[in-house]
């Protein structure tokens, strides 16, 4: 059985979630923490650390169950943000694919992230080749 973890990174509006759905498998992202059962998105910046902890916990549970393909789509502008996922993947025998999704289609972020915040994310975005 081939086990894969896809880590999709990029700025808000780049198409991470759309690509994640295209890849198939089990899709998770911190934004899901803020979406209620009726599909309404209610972002609370004070809950962002909790949302990311929830996402990591869910990935850990899925890996423990041996789910073959897990796709995580978060901004992950800094490399340290991927480290917990890389560690879990190694411990559970997952091959990791890290993809940076660029906003080449002019997509808008659906969560109303202010342009100043996106600019800060862009300025701190780290890449390791």
Language-model segments: residues:
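Walker A (P-loop) ATP-phosphate-binding motif of ABC ATPase nucleotide-binding domains
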Residues: 5
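Hydrophobic anchor at the beta1->P-loop junction of P-loop NTPases
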Residues: 8
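The conserved Walker
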Residues: 11-12
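Conserved glycine(s) of the Walker
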Residues: 15
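Hydrophobic positions on the alpha1 helix immediately C-terminal to the Walker A/P-loop
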Residues: 19
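Active-site signature of alpha/beta-hydrolase-fold catalytic machinery across serine-
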Residues: 22
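Short beta-strand-centered segment that lines the nucleotide-binding/catalytic pocket of NTP-utilizing
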Residues: 26-38
């Amino acid at each position: 059985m081939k086990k894969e973890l896809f880590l999709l990174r990029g700025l808000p509006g780049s198409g991470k979630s759309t690509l994640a759905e295209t890849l198939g498998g089990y899709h998770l992202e911190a934004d899901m923490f803020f979406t209620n059962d009726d599909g309404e998105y209610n972002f609370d910046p004070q809950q962002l650390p909790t949302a990311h902890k929830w996402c990591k916990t869910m990935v850990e549970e899925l890996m423990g169950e041996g789910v073959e393909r897990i796709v995580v789509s978060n901004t992950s502008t800094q490399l340290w943000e991927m480290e917990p996922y890389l560690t879990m993947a190694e411990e559970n025998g997952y091959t990791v694919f890290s993809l940076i999704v660029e906003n080449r289609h002019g997509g808008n972020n659906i969560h109303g992230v202010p342009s100043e915040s996106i600019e800060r994310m862009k300025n701190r975005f780290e890449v390791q080749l």
